[in-house]
Amino acid sequence: MLQRLLVLRQHKERRLRQQLAHLRQAYQQREQQLADCRRERQQLCQQLQKLAQWRGNLLPAQASAQRERQHELYQAERQRQKQIGEWVALGQQQLAAIEAQQLLLRCNQREQEKLGMLINHESNRY
């Protein structure tokens, strides 16, 4: 009976480790997406800054086109900023899930140790 419980706990450990690996991989992918999004936002901010520097030196027709371009860049930058906030929130959720998974794994390992000691104790009794 105890041996069967130990085998079940070992299967559970394998499953928990696989899930933990998947969670960590998803977290790393999201971290990369966050870095990419931040880089894109930085590039958009630089483009906006360059457009703002030229603003007073343009003819009215050029200034109108520049305002449209500046508005498009601003909208894209705001979208990236929103996406960054979403990626950060998701990252916090993923970290919490990883920590919870690690806790489950540690608890399962303790249970396996207890079962192992009980099995040893039981076999030593006879």
Task: Report each predicted region and the residues it spans.
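Charge-rich amphipathic alpha-helical interaction elements
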Residues: 1-126
